[in-house]
């Protein structure tokens, strides 16, 4: 720029980089890009900043809708149920013969057809309760004990000793959490009331106090029982072990090459930074372009069977980010036709990338909109290849594209208007799309199950919680049972359990693994010898096992490094063995800071 701020002759000729001449180079970002960066700020600092940004009226409304109202409903249920039961019996007993039978049949029919949705609601409430009370209390106690004891033992502790310590701390944490819960029950019990009368419905406000006391007792009882159950189950099950050796590849049999990427965090701007890393991480999407370029060359040299991306395709689930991801993939049709994707927490649970303190109310269209963006992308990438599960028959149903065809107009209308009515109608559609199954090509081939492991959260700061719904797990197991000779990749975003490696900080150990991870591993146990779980989420390069189940954790080819530092991903080779799926030594693909060769 000249002295008056105009472009000089040399600048007009294209020889000057205006950004580099600016006082603040916009490509380098600024403090606003570090608002939620865990790489440059502590969780305490981020949490402190959130307090000044939170909308407290909105927080109060969210607290009422998500905690207080469910607690009152939960606590009032025994009172209202008693009233309803007595009144219903009185009326049924007054109806002669056939009338009584018809009423009972009607009640049974409503229960039968409403049961699947009711189970979803009950399960979501149960695991919401776990994520609010049981999981934080139990996991906090367990991980604090582990962190302290592993710190005392030091790095010389062997893997077998660490496994025993982790089993013992699980049992101890369950006992401590149960004792705290019993103390809460003792405090609330004098204010409880478990029977009601019809007259109580005329003055419902007088039920609030006993209902809240009932809720405290019920929640605490759940905490006591669940903590003990989790502690015993976690202590008794096989502990995670790091894999030191891999299976040999010389045996005859079918092999599959699977490129496993995760957490690519596509941004919608050429110089955009990521939420987690801020200025401590890379800008733009150059690393993704480099990874796809390398994959193209590797595929041309030796064909890949699958390109699996286990979540966090985008940084915040915005439309521009999905557009950038699909544009990059569209340029490489040979990769696109064998790519499989599943949702991560950044694809679904970031309410506002610029403001971590923002809340999504249960009535907000934002969450459903992010789900529909992800579903639309999954349909475009793999809809004609993967199939949904017919839960009533316990076997594979139509392809994802066929399943969504009757709902395309509703999805488009909701994306255009954000209508609450349309949003409610799309809730069950989203839930029933999982697990998505790429069936094995032969009876003894390799199938891929794509799960949604994201718990429903309404706050960016708690976006990372994970959960595999029991209905989804049962659907997966029924398909695996139906294809009795096949091998399986069970793909999800969240890590099943905390890694069996020492952590530098306590914050690294808490709140990001599956809430019900140990339960899910036990469900997979009958199929463990012919299944491999693949996930991402924490950007940790780790391969291990839990009993017979092999587990592969993918590093991020994008995160955990600046632009001038290398990253990597892996190509895994799987081989069919005698009744088992073998994992051969992986091939590491390094993404250099500037190279393209």
Features from the language model and the residues they span:
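N-terminal active-site segment of His-dependent metallophosphoesterases
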Residues: 17, 21-102, 112-169, 194-324
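Beta-strand-turn-beta hairpins that frame and shape the catalytic cleft
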Residues: 247-259, 266, 431-450, 484-487, ...
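Active-site neighborhood of phospho(di)ester-bond hydrolases with catalytic His/Asp-centered motifs
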Residues: 260-262, 305-312, 338-345, 451, ...
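Active-site-proximal segments of metal-dependent phosphoesterases and phosphodiesterases across multiple
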Residues: 455-474, 481-530
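Conserved beta-sheet core of the metallophosphoesterase superfamily
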Residues: 330, 500-580
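A short C-terminal boundary segment appended to hydrolase-like catalytic domains
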Residues: 574-597
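Extended active-site neighborhood of metal-dependent phosphoesterases/phosphodiesterases
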Residues: 243-247, 324-475, 557-559, 563-564, ...
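Active-site environment of divalent metal-dependent phosphoester hydrolases
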Residues: 267-270, 315-317, 345-353, 456-459, ...
